[in-house]
Amino acid sequence: MGFQVLRSVIQAPLAKRSFLCKSCPSGLRVLYNNILLSSRSYSTKGSAFTLIKKLRQETNAPIFLIKEAVEETNGQSFFEAKSVLSEKMKARGQRLAQQLQGRVAKQGWICTAILPDAQAACMLELNCESDFVAQNPKIQRLALSSASSILHSLNRVNADSTEQRNVSTDLDSLKKIILHSDKDSSSNLGNTLFDAFSNATSTTGERIELSRAIVFQRTKPQHQLGRYTHGTDVRVHSSLGRVGCLVSLSNAQKAGLADDIAREFVAQDPESIDDFLHNTSVYDNSKTMKDLLGSANVVDWVRWERGQAQ
C-alpha cells in the first residue's frame, strides 16, 4: 500500500507532491527524496554532457580543457564556458608554442589574397609540422583568413604609400592584426592572428607558424596585379598551394594578364627577369614570354615555395 502511495506521489503534478508525500510512511519519504535528488543529479549531468558535446563540435578543443571550462562555469552557460575555454586554449597554445620552438615546421600553405578592386594583393606562408594537419579544413581556413586580414590591414596602413611593394618582415607586428573571415572583411572573429595561431597549436599539438608575408599595392591606374598558387586539389581552394607568386605589371592591355604571367613564373622558376622574358611559354610554346607580355612590363614579382622561408 505504501509503495502505491509513493507511486502516486512521483506521478503527481509538482504542486501536489508535498501534500501527498505527508501521507507516506517515513521510510518511503526518505526513498522519495533520494529519487528526487538522483533525478536532479542526472539532469545536471545530462546538461553538462550536452554542453561538452556542443563545445567539442564548435571548437574541436581537447576534451579535458572543455570539461575544465564546463566545471568552472557550473555547466550553466554555453557562452560562459566557451569564453573560459577560449582563454584556456590560448594559454595552452602559448605554452606549447614555447615547447615546440625547436621543432621543424615545413608543411602548410602558401596562400594568396587580392582585393575585389585588385588595388592590393597579399601572399603569406603558414607552416605546420605535418601534411595531416595541413589538410585540416580549419588550418586551411586559418591561412585564408590570415591572408585576407593582413591584406586589408596593411593596405589601409599604406594607403598613401608611393611604393609599389610593401614587405613586412616584422612578423610580431603582423600577429597583432585582428583576424577576420576571408569571406567578410568587415567581420571580427575576436582574436588577433597570434591568438588564432595559439589556438591552432593548442588544438593540433603542432607548431603553427606564420613564416613570411608580403603585400603588393597598385599605385598607378595602368598597373595590374596578379597572383597564382599551385600544388593542391582545386576542390580545397584555388588560393592555397605549395608554390605561389605575386606579379605587378605596367601598361597591361589585357584583363587577367598578370594572373597568366604569375602562373608562368610559378611554372618556370626563372633566375632573373631577363631569363624569363626569353623563355618559351609553358602554356603556349609558340610564344616567348616577351610575346605574351606585348606592351606590358614586369614591374615586380615574388615567387615562394613552401618550406623555404629563411
UniProtKB/Swiss-Prot annotation:
Disulfide bridges in this chain: none
UniProt key word Protein biosynthesis: yes
Transit peptide: 1-42
Any one GO biological process: mitochondrial translational elongation
A single cellular component GO annotation: mitochondrion
Keyword Transit peptide tagged: yes
Localization, UniProt: Mitochondrion
Keywords: Elongation factor, Mitochondrion, Protein biosynthesis, Transit peptide
Pfam families linked to this entry: EF_TS
GO MF annotations in UniProt: translation elongation factor activity
General function of this protein: Associates with the EF-Tu.GDP complex and induces the exchange of GDP to GTP. It remains bound to the aminoacyl-tRNA.EF-Tu.GTP complex up to the GTP hydrolysis stage on the ribosome.
HAMAP family according to UniProt: EF_Ts (MF_00050)
Family designation: Belongs to the EF-Ts family.
Protein name per its UniProtKB record: Elongation factor Ts, mitochondrial
